[in-house]
A protein has these predicted regions:
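Beta-propeller blade termini and top-face loops
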Residues: 1-252
Length: 252
């Protein structure tokens, strides 16, 4: 059986929800729809529950509007990373990656590209929580159309918990990129996968060296602006799933 646990809050859409591994009573929710199109609903920041969703508290980042990803440190539920796409309809500085080390009492922006570019995906290294990969996405919605992609889109990596970031581009398509999806091996730190939207070289990419270089494996990337979600099998990182209208699976 199921019951609603968020109906009393003043927002109706989630971008992501994360459960603390070190204390499963604690949940964090990033509000605002992460998908594109005319009907994308915005949110009002991050919420936290300490009783498995029975009650919720707003803990900030109200002006981020669209949150795509929330990651909780596996050993410390007070450390949380939030990936914000920002306001879909206008330029704003409330985009990028925000980090809290005190359970949401305060936030620090640790990655910012520009006022048109936010975060569409993030993954944390399963063996080293100081290593985080982030996919940035330049996107804006206008009355007359939608602009998805640009020079701001790319893949970034930190090895020190967000203090410094490096852009990972070797082997990826040149020029403007669109939406990017990320997945990381749950047992081998250097194995990464990415779906890349590009005018000529869209497809499924793999890195075997922690993102230093990438190799295009195939051209599969259906309707990237809607989907671009991939996941690895927790026991065998050669098994990867891709969500689209259909469900795709690879074993090699």
């Amino acid at each position: 059986t199921w019951k609603p646990v968020f109906d009393n809050e003043a927002v109706s859409t989630f971008g992501d929800i994360a459960i603390s591994k070190s204390n499963t009573n604690i949940l964090y929710v990033g509000t605002g729809e992460q998908q594109n199109r005319q009907s994308s609903s915005w949110g009002n920041g991050v919420y936290k529950s300490t009783d498995q969703g029975e009650t919720w508290q707003s803990i900030g980042l109200e002006k981020t509007f669209h949150i795509s990803k929330v990651i909780v440190h596996p050993a410390n539920s007070n450390i949380v990373y939030v990936g914000a796409l920002g306001n879909l309809w206008k330029e704003s500085e409330e985009r990028g990656i925000y980090k809290t080390t005190n359970g949401g009492k305060s936030w620090k922006k640790i990655l910012y590209v520009d006022d048109k570019t936010g975060i569409i995906d993030m993954v944390m290294d399963a063996n080293n929580p100081n290593i985080v990969y982030a996919a940035t996405y330049q996107r804006m919605r206008k009355v007359w159309g939608f602009n998805g992609g640009g020079a701001g889109s790319g893949i970034y990596k930190t090895t020190n918990g967000g203090a410094n970031w490096s852009k990972l581009s070797q082997g990826l398509p040149s020029g403007d990129l669109g939406r990017i999806g990320l997945a990381a091996s749950q047992n081998r730190s250097n194995i990464l996968y990415a779906t890349i939207e590009h005018s000529k070289e869209s497809g499924f990419y793999r890195s075997a060296n922690g993102g230093r270089s990438w190799k295009k494996m195939n051209t599969l990337n259906p309707r990237p602006m809607y989907y671009s979600h991939i996941a690895t099998d927790p026991k065998d990182d050669k098994i990867v799933y891709m969500l689209a209208v259909e469900l795709y699976r690879t074993e090699d």
